[in-house]
């Protein structure tokens, strides 16, 4: 039977109705600080913990519930003779229900509060009570989520006690709650730079907090279950995770992956640009005078693959752009915004998933990345691979001309465009570019020469006079020879092959230009 509950919450959602239901059952309510005040003002009978323990709050409220009469009442094992003797000797009544959620530490961090303020929002007594109650879940219920208030109250009203199954459910939730709280603190402190020490690039212990945003219909395939988890803080750069879904069917696992690929690609450009993604790799990229023109030019690179694709634009969508978008079946579109006419035009495509990411319209120079946002995580059974995200880029002055002929001004422009795109194509990656757009893309092949052949074979546009980007060096001259045969006139690649001399000789023989970046962009 539940006779006594300790209630101390920062999130007061649903607090008063829940407390009234407990009080109506004859449950004695103990409380502290703001929670006690809220209950008293609502007319709910409540006893202050200080009165209960005969020990007032001290140290400005830092010590409220850290008392044997509180934790003895929570932790004692009912029916165990030695525990029964201890609590009887010390006059410690049982506490059967603990209702606690913790100081808003994450909210303070997200709001950019000073370090000292954030430290004061680190809860001590709350997690201690939650862990005590969860450890003793055989006898005590612990509620950390207001969403569980109705379930708990209804069960108590029906049986005056919580079932083993309910207490175990609450126990799991409680430990997840405190684990996430501690991980948030660790993550914040790990990333903090001080005059004495910079944050560890890869800390000895990696703590991260993700909360389930929603279940997915399935994972990559229908036989795989899936869910989407969101980080505690929204990044300052554009984010699929925090983008607003304006219309369309629910997002799938594959949609989210493809949207991220599209977003990453379009974020390479300050100019008005569009990226079309299919199966997590670009099938068309272009800049344009308008967003609509950029999409139309990107689509022309591979119109067959663009069907059913994912589109990212870095400028707001107007009615003219919406008209272009509705001319093709698309799964998703993400952009900084949509005007009213565009929304009306796109509404006819009821299944089209429309996402808005306002930060996508801001200048790239304004984006800031916290240390944890510069990392990429991949799980393997029993481990986690962690690396820096591939945010590398090159300028013209970073490149070394490898051939006798240097690129023309137009070739330089096309080469640097191809280099921005090729890092987002699955390796082995080849991109033909001309006039600020891709004209052919080949990727995902197990040999570089086959990626060249694939790009040329699939090309819907004329590749003659184009410039080519390669994500890694050419191990043999055959790939370059195929590029020459296709009519391209310049190549940008990392360089560094044992056979660079052969590769350069093939380029010189054909009179084409080749430059080396010294930077590889493998994408597995």
UniProtKB/Swiss-Prot annotation:
The keyword Hydrolase applies. Coiled coil: none annotated. InterPro entries: AICAR_Tfase_dup_dom_sf, Cytidine_deaminase-like, MGS-like_dom, MGS-like_dom_sf, PurH-like. It comes from the Bacteria. SUPFAM superfamilies: Cytidine deaminase-like, Methylglyoxal synthase-like. Pathway: Purine metabolism; IMP biosynthesis via de novo pathway; 5-formamido-1-(5-phospho-D-ribosyl)imidazole-4-carboxamide from 5-amino-1-(5-phospho-D-ribosyl)imidazole-4-carboxamide (10-formyl THF route): step 1/1; Purine metabolism; IMP biosynthesis via de novo pathway; IMP from 5-formamido-1-(5-phospho-D-ribosyl)imidazole-4-carboxamide: step 1/1. PROSITE patterns: MGS (PS51855). GO terms for biological process: 'de novo' IMP biosynthetic process. Its EC number is 2.1.2.3, 3.5.4.10. GO terms for molecular function: IMP cyclohydrolase activity; phosphoribosylaminoimidazolecarboxamide formyltransferase activity. Keywords: Hydrolase, Multifunctional enzyme, Purine biosynthesis, Transferase. Residues 1-144 form the MGS-like domain. One of its GO terms (cellular component) is cytosol. Pfam families: AICARFT_IMPCHas (PF01808), MGS (PF02142). It catalyses: (6R)-10-formyltetrahydrofolate + 5-amino-1-(5-phospho-beta-D-ribosyl)imidazole-4-carboxamide = 5-formamido-1-(5-phospho-D-ribosyl)imidazole-4-carboxamide + (6S)-5,6,7,8-tetrahydrofolate; IMP + H2O = 5-formamido-1-(5-phospho-D-ribosyl)imidazole-4-carboxamide. PANTHER family: BIFUNCTIONAL PURINE BIOSYNTHESIS PROTEIN ATIC, BIFUNCTIONAL PURINE BIOSYNTHESIS PROTEIN PURH. Belongs to the PurH family. The IMP cyclohydrolase activity resides in the N-terminal region. This is Bifunctional purine biosynthesis protein PurH. It comes from Anaeromyxobacter dehalogenans (strain 2CP-C).
